[in-house]
Amino acid sequence: LSDAPLDEATAKYWKAMTSGGSTGRPKLIVSKDPATVEPLGEKLGLVPEQVALMPGPLYHNGPFSMGMIALQYGYHLVITSRFDASETLALIEQHGVQLIYMVPTMMQRMWRLPSSERDAYDISSLRLAWHMAAPCPAWLKEAFIEWFGGDVLMELYGGTEAQGFTTISGTEWLAHRGSVGKIVEGYSLKIVDSEGRPVPRGEVGEVYLLPDEGQGVSYFYIGAEATADVGGWESLGDMGYVDDDGYLYLTDRRSDMI
Protein backbone atom coordinates (compact mmCIF):
# COMPACT_ATOMS: atom_id res chain seq x y z
CA LEU A 1 0.00 0.00 0.00
CA SER A 2 1.19 3.49 -0.79
CA ASP A 3 2.13 5.89 1.99
CA ALA A 4 0.94 8.80 -0.15
CA PRO A 5 -1.84 10.86 1.43
CA LEU A 6 -5.34 10.14 0.22
CA ASP A 7 -6.97 12.51 -2.20
CA GLU A 8 -9.43 14.89 -0.62
CA ALA A 9 -12.96 13.49 -0.81
CA THR A 10 -15.88 15.86 -0.37
CA ALA A 11 -19.55 15.05 -0.85
CA LYS A 12 -21.02 17.02 -3.73
CA TYR A 13 -24.09 18.04 -1.71
CA TRP A 14 -24.04 18.54 2.04
CA LYS A 15 -27.73 17.94 2.78
CA ALA A 16 -30.99 16.77 1.21
CA MET A 17 -33.92 17.64 3.44
CA THR A 18 -37.51 16.44 2.98
CA SER A 19 -40.34 18.95 2.92
CA GLY A 20 -43.87 19.37 1.68
CA GLY A 21 -44.04 23.05 2.51
CA SER A 22 -47.38 24.12 3.97
CA THR A 23 -49.65 21.97 1.79
CA GLY A 24 -47.56 20.41 -0.98
CA ARG A 25 -46.46 16.88 -1.81
CA PRO A 26 -43.26 15.70 -0.09
CA LYS A 27 -40.06 16.47 -1.98
CA LEU A 28 -36.32 16.53 -1.45
CA ILE A 29 -34.61 19.92 -1.18
CA VAL A 30 -30.98 19.28 -2.09
CA SER A 31 -28.42 21.90 -1.11
CA LYS A 32 -25.97 22.68 -3.91
CA ASP A 33 -23.21 23.53 -1.44
CA PRO A 34 -20.50 20.86 -1.00
CA ALA A 35 -19.82 19.25 2.38
CA THR A 36 -17.23 21.82 3.44
CA VAL A 37 -17.24 24.57 6.05
CA GLU A 38 -20.51 26.40 5.51
CA PRO A 39 -19.94 30.15 4.96
CA LEU A 40 -23.29 30.87 6.62
CA GLY A 41 -21.69 29.92 9.94
CA GLU A 42 -19.71 33.15 10.04
CA LYS A 43 -22.86 35.14 9.33
CA LEU A 44 -24.56 33.30 12.20
CA GLY A 45 -21.79 34.35 14.57
CA LEU A 46 -20.27 30.90 15.10
CA VAL A 47 -16.81 30.75 16.64
CA PRO A 48 -14.74 27.56 16.15
CA GLU A 49 -14.37 24.85 18.78
CA GLN A 50 -17.17 25.61 21.20
CA VAL A 51 -20.18 23.62 22.47
CA ALA A 52 -23.58 23.51 20.75
CA LEU A 53 -26.88 22.00 21.93
CA MET A 54 -29.49 20.88 19.38
CA PRO A 55 -32.60 19.79 21.33
CA GLY A 56 -34.71 19.56 18.16
CA PRO A 57 -35.10 16.52 15.86
CA LEU A 58 -32.39 16.29 13.21
CA TYR A 59 -34.90 15.42 10.49
CA HIS A 60 -35.97 19.08 10.64
CA ASN A 61 -33.90 21.51 8.60
CA GLY A 62 -33.21 24.00 11.39
CA PRO A 63 -31.53 21.78 13.99
CA PHE A 64 -29.89 19.63 11.31
CA SER A 65 -28.37 22.59 9.48
CA MET A 66 -27.32 24.44 12.62
CA GLY A 67 -25.87 21.25 14.08
CA MET A 68 -23.93 20.31 10.95
CA ILE A 69 -22.58 23.84 10.52
CA ALA A 70 -21.46 23.73 14.16
CA LEU A 71 -19.68 20.40 13.55
CA GLN A 72 -17.93 21.91 10.54
CA TYR A 73 -16.67 24.64 12.86
CA GLY A 74 -15.26 22.08 15.27
CA TYR A 75 -17.99 22.30 17.89
CA HIS A 76 -18.71 19.61 20.46
CA LEU A 77 -22.34 18.81 19.57
CA VAL A 78 -24.85 17.80 22.25
CA ILE A 79 -28.10 16.24 20.99
CA THR A 80 -31.16 14.82 22.75
CA SER A 81 -33.62 12.05 21.87
CA ARG A 82 -36.56 14.37 22.63
CA PHE A 83 -37.03 17.90 23.92
CA ASP A 84 -37.43 18.38 27.64
CA ALA A 85 -37.37 21.89 29.10
CA SER A 86 -35.63 21.02 32.37
CA GLU A 87 -33.11 18.73 30.68
CA THR A 88 -32.26 21.47 28.18
CA LEU A 89 -31.32 23.89 30.96
CA ALA A 90 -29.41 21.14 32.78
CA LEU A 91 -27.42 20.31 29.63
CA ILE A 92 -26.52 23.98 29.12
CA GLU A 93 -25.06 24.05 32.62
CA GLN A 94 -23.45 20.59 32.42
CA HIS A 95 -21.65 21.12 29.11
CA GLY A 96 -21.08 24.88 29.24
CA VAL A 97 -23.15 25.26 26.06
CA GLN A 98 -22.42 28.40 24.04
CA LEU A 99 -24.82 27.86 21.09
CA ILE A 100 -28.38 26.56 21.17
CA TYR A 101 -31.13 26.17 18.56
CA MET A 102 -34.76 26.64 19.60
CA VAL A 103 -38.25 27.07 18.20
CA PRO A 104 -40.94 29.11 20.00
CA THR A 105 -42.72 25.97 21.25
CA MET A 106 -39.55 24.98 23.10
CA MET A 107 -39.22 28.50 24.46
CA GLN A 108 -42.78 28.42 25.81
CA ARG A 109 -42.17 25.11 27.58
CA MET A 110 -38.98 26.45 29.13
CA TRP A 111 -40.75 29.60 30.29
CA ARG A 112 -43.62 27.59 31.81
CA LEU A 113 -41.19 26.02 34.28
CA PRO A 114 -41.42 27.49 37.78
CA SER A 115 -39.15 30.52 38.05
CA SER A 116 -37.33 28.83 40.93
CA GLU A 117 -36.45 25.92 38.61
CA ARG A 118 -35.37 28.19 35.74
CA ASP A 119 -33.19 30.24 38.04
CA ALA A 120 -31.56 27.15 39.55
CA TYR A 121 -29.53 26.49 36.37
CA ASP A 122 -26.39 28.36 35.36
CA ILE A 123 -26.81 29.35 31.71
CA SER A 124 -24.18 32.09 31.72
CA SER A 125 -22.07 30.18 29.16
CA LEU A 126 -24.58 30.94 26.37
CA ARG A 127 -23.25 33.19 23.60
CA LEU A 128 -25.89 32.56 20.94
CA ALA A 129 -29.46 31.30 21.26
CA TRP A 130 -31.00 31.11 17.79
CA HIS A 131 -34.76 30.71 17.36
CA MET A 132 -36.59 30.30 14.05
CA ALA A 133 -39.13 28.16 12.12
CA ALA A 134 -42.28 29.80 13.54
CA PRO A 135 -43.52 33.21 14.74
CA CYS A 136 -42.53 34.03 18.31
CA PRO A 137 -45.13 35.83 20.47
CA ALA A 138 -43.94 39.28 21.54
CA TRP A 139 -44.38 38.57 25.25
CA LEU A 140 -42.25 35.42 24.98
CA LYS A 141 -39.56 37.22 22.99
CA GLU A 142 -39.40 39.95 25.64
CA ALA A 143 -39.13 37.37 28.41
CA PHE A 144 -36.22 35.57 26.73
CA ILE A 145 -34.42 38.82 25.93
CA GLU A 146 -34.54 39.66 29.64
CA TRP A 147 -33.55 36.10 30.62
CA PHE A 148 -30.84 35.29 28.06
CA GLY A 149 -29.75 38.81 27.11
CA GLY A 150 -30.42 41.00 24.10
CA ASP A 151 -27.14 40.15 22.39
CA VAL A 152 -27.55 36.39 22.99
CA LEU A 153 -31.09 35.84 21.71
CA MET A 154 -31.13 35.82 17.90
CA GLU A 155 -33.85 35.16 15.31
CA LEU A 156 -33.55 33.94 11.72
CA TYR A 157 -36.17 33.99 8.96
CA GLY A 158 -35.66 31.97 5.80
CA GLY A 159 -36.46 28.71 4.04
CA THR A 160 -34.81 25.34 3.57
CA GLU A 161 -34.06 26.36 -0.01
CA ALA A 162 -31.76 29.15 1.27
CA GLN A 163 -32.91 31.78 -1.21
CA GLY A 164 -32.23 34.38 1.46
CA PHE A 165 -32.24 35.03 5.19
CA THR A 166 -32.99 37.84 7.60
CA THR A 167 -31.58 37.98 11.13
CA ILE A 168 -32.16 40.15 14.17
CA SER A 169 -30.72 40.29 17.69
CA GLY A 170 -32.83 40.78 20.78
CA THR A 171 -31.36 44.25 21.23
CA GLU A 172 -32.35 45.23 17.69
CA TRP A 173 -35.80 43.73 18.20
CA LEU A 174 -36.48 46.00 21.18
CA ALA A 175 -35.99 48.96 18.82
CA HIS A 176 -37.96 47.27 15.99
CA ARG A 177 -40.59 45.26 17.84
CA GLY A 178 -42.11 42.47 15.78
CA SER A 179 -39.44 42.50 13.08
CA VAL A 180 -37.67 39.37 11.84
CA GLY A 181 -34.61 41.41 10.89
CA LYS A 182 -32.60 42.71 7.98
CA ILE A 183 -31.55 40.74 4.91
CA VAL A 184 -28.18 39.01 5.33
CA GLU A 185 -25.28 40.13 3.14
CA GLY A 186 -25.17 38.12 -0.08
CA TYR A 187 -28.94 38.15 -0.59
CA SER A 188 -31.62 40.62 -1.67
CA LEU A 189 -35.21 41.16 -0.55
CA LYS A 190 -38.17 42.94 -2.13
CA ILE A 191 -41.86 43.45 -1.34
CA VAL A 192 -44.29 43.38 -4.28
CA ASP A 193 -48.02 43.81 -4.85
CA SER A 194 -50.38 41.31 -6.51
CA GLU A 195 -49.18 42.51 -9.94
CA GLY A 196 -45.53 41.93 -9.08
CA ARG A 197 -44.70 45.63 -8.70
CA PRO A 198 -42.43 46.79 -5.85
CA VAL A 199 -44.34 48.62 -3.11
CA PRO A 200 -43.15 51.62 -1.04
CA ARG A 201 -41.52 51.19 2.36
CA GLY A 202 -44.12 50.45 5.02
CA GLU A 203 -46.66 49.00 2.58
CA VAL A 204 -47.64 45.32 2.85
CA GLY A 205 -46.96 42.97 -0.05
CA GLU A 206 -45.52 39.54 -0.77
CA VAL A 207 -41.94 38.93 0.39
CA TYR A 208 -39.48 37.80 -2.30
CA LEU A 209 -35.87 36.68 -1.85
CA LEU A 210 -32.93 36.24 -4.22
CA PRO A 211 -29.27 35.23 -3.75
CA ASP A 212 -26.89 37.80 -5.23
CA GLU A 213 -25.47 34.99 -7.41
CA GLY A 214 -28.89 34.37 -8.93
CA GLN A 215 -31.81 31.96 -8.65
CA GLY A 216 -31.09 28.26 -8.29
CA VAL A 217 -27.55 28.57 -6.90
CA SER A 218 -28.47 27.23 -3.46
CA TYR A 219 -30.73 24.21 -4.12
CA PHE A 220 -32.62 21.95 -6.47
CA TYR A 221 -35.70 19.78 -5.96
CA ILE A 222 -36.21 16.08 -6.41
CA GLY A 223 -39.91 15.39 -6.82
CA ALA A 224 -40.97 18.95 -7.66
CA GLU A 225 -40.21 21.85 -9.97
CA ALA A 226 -38.88 25.15 -8.64
CA THR A 227 -40.91 28.22 -9.54
CA ALA A 228 -39.53 31.74 -9.66
CA ASP A 229 -40.66 35.22 -10.63
CA VAL A 230 -39.06 37.23 -13.44
CA GLY A 231 -35.40 37.69 -12.59
CA GLY A 232 -35.29 34.58 -10.42
CA TRP A 233 -36.97 36.03 -7.32
CA GLU A 234 -38.68 33.43 -5.09
CA SER A 235 -41.30 33.70 -2.37
CA LEU A 236 -41.84 31.57 0.73
CA GLY A 237 -45.51 32.59 0.64
CA ASP A 238 -45.27 35.26 3.33
CA MET A 239 -46.75 38.76 3.33
CA GLY A 240 -44.98 41.63 5.03
CA TYR A 241 -43.40 45.04 4.79
CA VAL A 242 -40.02 46.74 5.27
CA ASP A 243 -39.64 49.81 7.49
CA ASP A 244 -37.51 52.88 6.80
CA ASP A 245 -34.50 51.23 8.47
CA GLY A 246 -34.69 48.11 6.28
CA TYR A 247 -36.22 45.76 8.86
CA LEU A 248 -38.71 43.15 7.64
CA TYR A 249 -42.04 42.56 9.39
CA LEU A 250 -44.24 39.55 8.52
CA THR A 251 -47.99 40.07 8.59
CA ASP A 252 -49.66 36.99 7.08
CA ARG A 253 -49.39 33.95 4.86
CA ARG A 254 -50.46 34.46 1.25
CA SER A 255 -52.45 31.20 1.39
CA ASP A 256 -54.40 32.49 4.42
CA MET A 257 -55.67 35.59 2.60
CA ILE A 258 -59.14 35.75 1.05
Predicted regions, residues:
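Short beta-strand->loop structural element characteristic of the AMP-binding/adenylate-forming
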Residues: L1, K27-V30, H76-R82, M154
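Conserved AMP-binding/adenylation subdomain of ANL enzymes
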Residues: P34-V51, Y59-L99, L113
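Conserved ATP-binding/catalytic segment of the ANL
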Residues: P200-G202, Y208-I258
